[in-house]
Amino acid sequence: MELRAQVGAPYIHDPSTIVECDGKYYTFGTGGGGLISEDGWTWKSGAVRPGRGAAPDAIKIGDRYLVAYSSTGGGSANGHVGSVLTMWNKTLDPDSADFAFTEPVVVATSNGHEDCDAIDAGLLMGPDGRLWLTYGTYYGYIRIVELDPSTGFRIEGNEPVDIAISCEASVPIYRDGWYYLLATHGTCCSGANSTYNIVVGRSKSPTGPYVDNVGRDM
């Protein structure tokens, strides 16, 4: 198998899941904007995401694209006031006549006093058609909450569930009958002194419990 590095102008912070739209690939990052690629290897700037904010994620549902992002700047040892918002678009191509994001809607919040920060959105459409959002950072819990796949709104009465702790940048994945939760543990953004590492657990239910390969609950 041939291994190749990405080329072009691939700088991006907190990139989202890569999504295909009309033969091109898109990823979004913290601060707004993102990257576009025609082959998945060579990237250039040009993706457009309004709202700025942090750590977005994106998913295709039917013939539309749902983007989630956080209106907060990052974790804090004392908690962080913030919110996760979702918005739709018919296309991710900023040159298309159909390109227009809907008004963002708040689907999760943190008040600065609880053990969770509303940041680092992760989206998953399960095999049963249910839509899930994970969020949170290393100073508290990772939480999961169910969204309506037709609106992107939080389902009324659905309360977030704590599924992990002391990690961030969570990504929920479904594969072969199992729900997987990938997240990062340690510290980032310190060059060679960074201690970031990826942790993973799996569960038969999207709401957990997620356990690792030796049975430890995340």
Where are these regions (language model features)?
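Carbohydrate-active catalytic/glycan-binding domains of CAZyme proteins
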Residues: M1-M218
